[in-house]
């Protein structure tokens, strides 16, 4: 994920109530100059960590009490506004890259696959925009 998207995600996460961010090594460094600038400094204040590419992070998240939510364009996805998503205390929201999305293995282990309903023939948003919409709906209302 490029530095601009990483910075924008940090900014939205901080502004809209996410408590922390977990990155994979496919993500740009949030402290990279462009990321930090776009984040408006939130990359220095919002806690974050990395999952090793070889770790079973879905298992780790679930064993830590998180309900996992994968954002993906799938026919079986529930809409972001579905009340079932608000019934869980700790949510871990997983976003994929814009080019390849989320791996099938990760999707199969997720508690929920969620889609942002779209209008006017648009099927998706940029990952930074999608994260902002998602954080607003799940964490700030």
Locate each region found by the language model.
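Short, charged, surface-exposed secondary-structure boundary motifs
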Residues: 60, 79-80, 124-128
């Amino acid at each position: 994920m490029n530095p601009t998207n990483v910075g924008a995600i940090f900014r939205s996460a901080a502004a809209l109530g996410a408590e922390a961010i977990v990155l994979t090594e496919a993500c740009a460094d949030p402290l990279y100059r462009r990321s930090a600038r776009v984040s408006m400094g939130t990359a220095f204040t919002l806690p974050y960590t990395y999952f090793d590419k070889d770790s079973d992070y879905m298992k780790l998240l679930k064993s830590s009490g998180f309900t996992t939510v994968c954002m993906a364009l799938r026919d079986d996805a529930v809409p972001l506004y579905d009340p079932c998503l608000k019934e869980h205390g700790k949510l871990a929201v997983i976003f994929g890259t814009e080019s390849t999305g989320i791996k099938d293995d990760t999707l199969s282990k997720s508690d929920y696959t969620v889609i942002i309903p779209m209008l006017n023939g648009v099927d998706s948003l940029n990952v930074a925009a999608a994260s902002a919409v998602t954080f607003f709906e799940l964490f700030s209302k």
